[in-house]
């Protein structure tokens, strides 16, 4: 049930879903992981592409990607030796789209 202004929040629903929200918010609390999620919004990118766009070492990027994989926020697809990443769920996409509207489009 979505929260409507003036409507009481359903405490049981909130408790049930808050753990999933915390996982996503913790991942986004790190600037590099947030940047990775933003880059994956409408793109499937390889580790090499992410590394060059972020100007981040392969080992540092691997640690961030491992965090995102562990928490189920990204999907992977392997093609030969190349691993490609995409966002894993509509919730992740919706949150990144919201942040983009609030912080990126507002500045244009």
UniProtKB/Swiss-Prot annotation:
Superkingdom of the source species: Bacteria
GO biological process: regulation of DNA-templated transcription
InterPro entries: ArsR-like_HTH, HTH_ArsR_DNA-bd_dom, HTH_MetalResp_TranReg, WH-like_DNA-bd_sf, WH_DNA-bd_sf
Gene3D superfamilies on file: Winged helix-like DNA-binding domain superfamily/Winged helix DNA-binding domain (1.10.10.10)
Signal peptide stretch: none
Domain HTH arsR-type: 13-107
Pfam families: HTH_5
DNA-binding residues (ranges): 47-66
Keyword Cell membrane: no
Keyword terms of this UniProt record: Activator, DNA-binding, Transcription, Transcription regulation, Virulence
GO MF entries: DNA binding; DNA-binding transcription factor activity
Function description: Up-regulates the expression of the hemolysin gene, hlyA, and may promote expression of other virulence determinants in vivo. It may have both positive and negative regulator activities.
Name this polypeptide is given: Transcriptional activator HlyU
Organism in which the protein naturally occurs: Vibrio cholerae serotype O1 (strain ATCC 39315 / El Tor Inaba N16961)
Taxon lineage: Bacteria, Pseudomonadati, Pseudomonadota, Gammaproteobacteria, Vibrionales
Gene: hlyU
């Amino acid at each position: 049930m979505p929260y409507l202004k003036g409507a009481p929040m359903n405490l049981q629903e909130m408790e049930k879903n808050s753990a999933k929200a915390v996982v996503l918010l913790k991942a986004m609390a790190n600037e590099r992981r947030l940047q990775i999620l933003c880059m994956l919004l409408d793109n499937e990118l390889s580790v090499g592409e992410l590394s060059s766009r972020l100007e981040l070492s392969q080992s540092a990027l691997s640690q961030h990607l491992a965090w995102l994989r562990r928490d189920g926020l990204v999907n992977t697809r392997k093609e030969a030796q190349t691993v490609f990443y995409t966002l894993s769920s509509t919730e992740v996409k919706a949150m990144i789209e919201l942040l983009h509207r609030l912080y990126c489009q507002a500045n244009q």
